[in-house]
């Protein structure tokens, strides 16, 4: 489903724990990391698409998370020219995304990236709140920065967030030169990737 401007409607998912860390996922068979995300199907609301993608990509169900916040506006990024499919009609030039901030309320052992036959990810880890903004692929960086800034304004403002989940000192920006933290790795089950993202 592509809109009139050539953007594909999409949802982005940020899952946090009580330490103020966020789930960072490794793309299947690649050394590339990102937040879970996926397209919105015809007839779906953004929230319905989010819960579907949450199960397909991370193996979590609605009962396993608490929805803390959803971005107010659509956030857009354009695909690099090398990723454009000029023979597709209509042509998709990028994604427009609604972002959701979720709190994990179950044990992390429930995270299972092999719920489907063609998983998007083969590993994950917890990282500091701002770490993904610096580490994501460059063409998604501005959208990540805007989404995380909006989430931070909610999480760390006691007048907007009555849960008082995190403290500022738990979300300092990660330095780019630091060693990558340990991640949960899944053994490959097949060689097929899922839909183009």
From Swiss-Prot:
A GO term, aspect molecular function: mRNA 5'-diphosphatase activity
Residue span, Nudix hydrolase domain: 6-149
PROSITE patterns: NUDIX, NUDIX_BOX
Reported cofactor(s): a divalent metal cation
Spans annotated as Disordered: 170-197
Pfam families linked to this entry: NUDIX
EC category: hydrolase
Protein name: RNA pyrophosphohydrolase
């Amino acid at each position: 489903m592509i809109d009139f401007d050539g953007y594909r409607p999409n949802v982005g998912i940020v899952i946090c724990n009580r330490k103020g860390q966020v789930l960072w996922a490794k793309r299947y068979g690649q050394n590339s990391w990102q937040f879970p995300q996926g397209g919105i199907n015809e007839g779906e609301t953004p929230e319905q698409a989010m819960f579907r993608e949450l199960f397909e990509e991370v193996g979590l169900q609605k009962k396993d998370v608490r929805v803390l916040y959803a971005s107010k506006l659509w956030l857009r990024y354009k695909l690099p020219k090398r990723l454009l499919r000029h023979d597709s009609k209509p042509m998709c030039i990028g994604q427009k995304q609604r972002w959701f901030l979720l709190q994990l309320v179950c044990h992390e052992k429930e995270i299972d990236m092999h719920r489907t036959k063609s998983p998007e990810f083969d590993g994950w880890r917890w990282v500091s709140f701002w770490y993904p903004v610096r580490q994501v692929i460059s063409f998604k960086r501005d959208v990540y920065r805007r989404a995380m800034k909006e989430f931070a304004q909610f999480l760390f403002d006691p007048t907007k967030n009555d849960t008082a989940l995190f403290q500022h000192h738990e979300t300092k920006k990660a330095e780019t030169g630091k060693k990558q933290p340990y991640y949960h790795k899944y053994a490959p089950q097949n060689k097929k990737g899922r839909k183009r993202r």
